Every structure is written in structure tokens, then in C-alpha cells.
Amino acid sequence: MAYLLQNGRPVLASPISSGRYGHLTKGGSFKILEKERTHYSSMYGRIVDARGNTIVADADADMPVPPGGKFIPAPMHYFMRFCGADGMHAGYLPGYPASHGCVRMPEQYAIAFFNSVGVGTPVSVFGRTSAGRYYSDRSQSAFLRRPRFGPPIGPRLAPPPPPWWR
């Protein structure tokens, strides 16, 4: 979960997908270094053939591209960089850590966070990523039994951000 704090209290909670095994999201204390509403990855994306069909869905920019094909950078809208190439942005949440190190969140929450923070806003990243692709039910249950900010707010229970955050 990502929490937006105001005066030390959580005012918004968003489900996230963080860095997968081998591309863990770096933990620590950071600050927002840059904000970009429409950002594209310079390192990751997909490769399409001459007809536009995806032939490599999780491609690195330095992978060979077939004749007539091209590399299409991954969109990272509402990007808030906080450490090197890592940041928070709108993206797909499969229910487990799946990114290359960034913190993905649903677009409505990314917009709310983006509109609420400025360059220099503190960011704290903590927690662990499971060694496997999916979190086990046991580790999810253990996390839910030990909430750090009171009862967790699941994506189905959390109301969408108010219109003034957009």
C-alpha cells in the first residue's frame, strides 16, 4: 500500500505493485526529485513487428528488434521520481510485485498523489517483496494481522479520491 500523509496522518491509501524479485524497489528515505505527467520509460517497454503485433511484451530497450519492427517505451503517466530511475506512477496492478522497481498504482490514485505532492516531498519506502512471483495467502494474512497504519483500506473499500485532488 502507498499512503499519502498530511500532518503525519494518512489521508489516502492506494494499492500498489512494487518491484518484482530481481528488480526490487529500493527501500529507504527519499524525496520527490521530478514530476512528469506524461512519462515514458527509456529502459523498458515492448517490441512490435511491422504489423504492430506485440512480439515481446516485457522488452528491454537494448534487445534486438526485427526488421520493420520497433521498440515501444512503456507509459508511466503521473510519474513521480524518487530514486534513480524509480518512481511512483499509474500502471497495471496484477496483485503481486511485478514492476522493474517502480511503485505502480491505479490511475485515479496516481493522479491524486501527483496533484498532492511537489518536488522535495519526502518519500519513505519500506516492506519486503516475496521471493516468489505471488504473495502466499499466509504472508498476506500475516501482513493484514499486523497493520502499521490501523486497519488496511483495500482497493474495494477505499473511496475514489475526491474531485479536488484531480
PLM regions: where:
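Exported/periplasmic cell-wall-interacting domains
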Residues: 23-27, 46-166
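Active-site/binding-pocket entry motifs
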Residues: 37-39, 94
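Hydrophobic alpha-helical segments and their boundary regions
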Residues: 17, 34, 41, 73-74, ...
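Flexible, glycine-rich phosphate/dinucleotide-binding loops
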Residues: 11, 41, 132
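Glycine-rich catalytic cores of cysteine/serine-nucleophile enzymes that process amide/ester linkages
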Residues: 1-34
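Short acidic, Gly/Pro-enriched loop/turn segments at secondary-structure junctions
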Residues: 39-46
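Short loop segments at secondary-structure junctions
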Residues: 8, 35-36, 85, 108
